[in-house]
Amino acid sequence: MGFKKFFGIRPPEEDTPERNRDLLTEEGIATKNPNSFRKEKFAAYGKFAAANAQDHVYAPAGYEQYARPGAGADKDELESLNRAATDAGDIGNTSRVGQPQQRDPYAVNDNYNPYANGTARDPYATAQPYARQAPVRQAGPRHAAGTPYGSAAVPQGGPGNPYGGSTAGAGTGRNPYQKNMNATVYPPAAGKTANPYASMAQDPYGKGEQRGIAGGPVAMPVPMQPRPQAAAETPRPQAAAEKRAPAVDVDDLNAVIEPTNEDDDLNNSIHEGNEGLNGQGQAPRRGFQTFEELQREQEMKQQMEEDEEVDEIKQQIRFTKQSSVASTRNTLKMAQDAELAGMNSLGMLGHQSEKLNNVERNLNLMKVQNRVAEDKVAELKRLNRNILAVHVGNPFTSKRKVREAEERIKNQRMQDKMQQEETTTQLMSSTNRIENALNDERHSVRERYQRDQALERAKKYQFENDEEDDEMEFEIDRNLDKIGQVSGRLKKLAIAAGQEIDSQQSRIKRIEEDADDMDIRIHLNTSRLTNIR
């Protein structure tokens, strides 16, 4: 039974973070309040940067999926990368027994290849070429299906085709001169004999026949197109009259002749046309021009050329103004886009400055608490020394040591306050710099009266100004003025961004140095605690 159980000695309970914070506050040590909330002015730009952040990966073309975490790490995908092309499972040209063969995705479907499509026309299109096949019926002679002697329908007993009623076959039991009823839709004219050669216009080797194995046509009768009426072979008198050329108009010799133009009447006297002139007829036309006429004609021609040149200049001016309007619009659009990008960049720099300020404040707090930890470690080491080592204070130097300790604490506190004020000043300077650059100060009063000034300046470039021309001049002047304003704001944004980047670089460097120093101090305190026995 140990002394701890005998005397009921138990280790103290471990303090919670809230209890430690209260103890540090009671001793006058600075702590961080978890309930305090600092308002951030550029938090929206932080959200914007997080939403537009992209994870850039570097991988060869086609392997981007393996660069992202969790993608391409499956076992099957890894095995597929290590699988050889000669493995049994990857050979695509061979198929197992009982499984259908896969279709080649790179095969070309040729409609003109008779062996590409398995149709009824190809006797070799079956999947099993050595299986038992049904015999193919073939016609005997070449003219079995398309003979001209079987296409003319003649009444029984008429003096028509003498071979129409023949039943003699050509080795197959089929009449090669059999009538084709589908080819004779209209009966022949009464009292006339049908032309036995009327159907010779049809090609017996057309697409109605199908070639068989032996080179002859396969016995597959295809209905032929109906031929026109036989009566159309002998045109009717009315049709012949209609086809006759139109008759030429012939003058009626019995009609009364009426003069078409009284002025050109040949029966009039030669003096009738000169009556009333009294010897004063029209002036004869001269074959030359006077100097005044030539000068007048030259002036008119010169005036027309000048008018054409003026019109051409007007068109060029109009085209140039329209091009200038479009150019100023595009320039203003690009300038506004550049300004928006600069404002977003500067806003994100402001959000970064606020985050750096939080890091600096936390580092300052860590410095203060680490100094307290150093004092506590030294006190713990003194209390944990040998019981025989008696420590007796020097009464002659005790007051001096107390004054030195108080002075040291006061100086340290002043140094901490100055460092805290410097951190706050840097944040305020960064915020004011960014706010001044982001503020868009537009003078509405100036924009209200600039129309009259723009039109007054544009008068020397106009010579026939209308409402549309005034609008173009005003838009050009307004766009140029806006481009100048945007350029000034862009310059201000660029200067502010450069100053902010320089300031943040120095702050980041100082944070890095403080973090390294803090790491060394914490490691040193940990080593001291480990050496205490």
From Swiss-Prot:
Query: Which superkingdom?
Result: Eukaryota
Instruction: Show where the t-SNARE coiled-coil homology domain sits.
Output: 318-380, 470-532
GO CC term (a single one): plasma membrane
InterPro entries (UniProt xref)? T_SNARE_dom
Q: Which molecular function terms from Gene Ontology are attached?
A: SNAP receptor activity; syntaxin binding
Biased composition, class Low complexity, residue ranges: 227-240
Q: Which SMART domains match?
A: t_SNARE
Basic and acidic residues compositional bias: what residue ranges?
11-24
Q: Which family does it belong to?
A: Belongs to the SNAP-25 family.
UniProt keyword list: Coiled coil, Protein transport, Repeat, Transport
* Name used for this protein in its record: Protein transport protein SEC9
What biological-process GO terms show up in the record? exocytosis; protein transport; SNARE complex assembly; vesicle fusion
Q: Which residues form a coiled coil?
A: none
In this chain, composition skew of type Gly residues spans 157-172
Q: Which gene encodes it?
A: SEC9
* Biased composition annotated in UniProt, kind: Polar residues: 92-102
Where do the record's region annotations for Disordered lie? 1-32, 68-184, 200-246, 259-284
